[in-house]
């Protein structure tokens, strides 16, 4: 198949195929080392799984190399956000990837995650295999059943998820799969996994580095990176399938997974969807089309972040300070403090305070103590104030005579949730009720924190911030 679309084609295939398209090459322009997955279990990756990782990396690289259009004042809702993406990629099983079902499933999950139109030209791969496929193993290393594979970011939610599994006597081996483009973040993940392992459970830590290389200019990279969730799910699936399990878990509180917009100017994928229930279902649809019957679940979806924190077993309290939430962590110089003003820092502080675990945090490691910065106001407190603005919008909807209808009016993206959580009319009705309960508990948590800080006085934001001008 030849792509006949006016958008430029990003060529990841072998050579130029006679049409003069420059090649975007592994190791020269980007790297991914999936060898740790094969080495952890003594099994080479299957052709189809290796292809899935190649597809994920091509998507990630294309996402980074094609800038989204800047938002002029005439386009306050950033309708020019979406792009047409055209990729030529060499795969080991082109017939599989050219099939109607696989194309449809791939386009559906990528379109939902990035709000871009993705077009692929799959050709036969002729490059040598990567080490994850080329190196044979004398003995397979099967994890002790029932093994659990979980995505592990090094944040609070994934720490609690891993700690609960380590603390559970009946659970088998725990496999933590981490993927990162930051050397420092991989070091933190390694440290946490080592500390978890020291508590007696077999913890297999699999870390997969990936990144763009110096052959591309960082100044030209797209920073939104909405495709990262696809990479994480692909690598997590590769680990689960290679380990011989049929389940993959990610650990994300429900408020973070739904990720409702804070402000009116945030439309569609301006809010990330990496852990959204629709993302998990669409990705599982793709896996089924590829003949991988993997179940992906989020056991913390019906909990707030504070409720997740409250489940942390006491013996792991000392690991809270090692975990990391700050959005700016990968870019920070070692030894520099957390920012304390990003939404991730603010929500972490709120959750630790509400759960009664704030004493476990070393607040001197923040440039500004998050809740104090929010109480004091100032120009750099707008992310936290945006969170409070969202809380007040939620409060108004939840106090209405028809709370679900009011919530849908305020946050139209909620409409997609019930059908991705439960099947059938009754199931969707139950899901709506549970979602309203989750949102009410979240609002009440902020009320309990507000009694001390008086944060509701800081809710007001200028119209140009709530309705446009802020990404």
Give, region by region, the residue ranges found by the protein language model:
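Hydrophobic positions on the alpha1 helix immediately C-terminal to the Walker A/P-loop
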Residues: 157-161
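RNA-binding accessory domains that recognize and position tRNA/RNA substrates
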Residues: 1-150, 162-212, 450-452, 459, ...
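Short, solvent-exposed polar/charged micro-motifs at secondary-structure junctions
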Residues: 97, 128-135, 214-220, 304-311, ...
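Short helix-capping/linker segments at secondary-structure and domain boundaries
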Residues: 66-79, 240-248, 352-357
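ATP-dependent adenylate-handling ligase core
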Residues: 42-45, 177-318
């Amino acid at each position: 198949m030849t792509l006949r679309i006016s958008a430029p084609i990003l060529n990841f295939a072998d050579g130029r195929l006679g049409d003069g398209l420059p090649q975007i090459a592994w190791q020269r322009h980007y790297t991914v080392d999936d060898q740790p997955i094969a080495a952890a279990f003594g099994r080479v990756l299957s052709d189809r799984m290796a292809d899935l990782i190649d597809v994920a990396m091509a998507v990630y690289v294309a996402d980074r190399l094609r800038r989204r259009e800047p938002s002029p004042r005439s386009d306050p809702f950033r309708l020019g956000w979406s792009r047409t993406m055209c990729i030529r990629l060499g795969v080991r099983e082109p017939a599989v990837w050219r099939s109607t079902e696989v194309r449809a499933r791939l386009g559906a999950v990528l379109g939902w995650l990035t709000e871009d139109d993705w077009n692929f030209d799959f050709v036969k791969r002729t490059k040598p295999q990567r080490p994850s496929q080329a190196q044979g193993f004398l003995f397979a290393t099967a994890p002790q059943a029932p093994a659990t594979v979980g995505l592990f970011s090094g944040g609070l939610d994934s720490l609690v998820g891993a700690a609960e599994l380590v603390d559970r006597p009946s659970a088998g081996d725990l496999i933590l799969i981490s993927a990162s483009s930051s050397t420092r973040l991989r070091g933190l993940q390694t440290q946490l996994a080592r500390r978890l392992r020291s508590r007696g459970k077999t913890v297999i830590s699999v870390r997969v580095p990936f990144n763009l290389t110096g052959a591309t200019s960082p100044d030209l990279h797209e920073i939104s990176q909405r495709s990262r969730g696809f990479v994480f799910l692909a690598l997590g699936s590769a680990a689960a399938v290679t380990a011989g399990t049929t389940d993959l878990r990610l650990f994300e509180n429900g408020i973070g997974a739904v990720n409702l917009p804070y402000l009116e100017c945030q439309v569609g994928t301006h809010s990330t969807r990496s852990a959204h229930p629709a993302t998990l279902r669409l990705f599982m649809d793709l896996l089924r089309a590829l003949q991988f019957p993997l179940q992906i679940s989020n056991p913390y979806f019906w909990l707030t972040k504070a409720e997740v924190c409250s489940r942390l077993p006491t013996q792991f309290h000392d690991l809270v300070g090692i975990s990391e939430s700050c959005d700016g962590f990968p870019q920070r110089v070692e030894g520099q403090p957390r920012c304390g003003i990003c939404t991730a820092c603010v929500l972490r502080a709120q959750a630790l305070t509400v759960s009664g675990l704030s004493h476990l945090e070393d607040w001197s490691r923040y440039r500004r103590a998050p809740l104090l910065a929010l109480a004091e106001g100032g120009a750099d407190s707008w992310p936290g104030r945006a969170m409070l603005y969202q809380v007040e919008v939620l409060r108004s909807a939840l106090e209405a005579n028809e709370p679900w209808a009011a919530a849908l009016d305020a946050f139209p993206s909620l409409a997609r949730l019930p059908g991705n959580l439960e099947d059938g009319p009754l199931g969707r009705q139950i899901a709506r009720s549970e979602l309203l309960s989750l949102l009410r508990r979240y609002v009440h948590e902020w009320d309990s924190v507000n009694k001390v800080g008086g944060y509701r006085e800081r809710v007001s934001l200028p119209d140009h911030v709530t309705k446009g001008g802020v990404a």
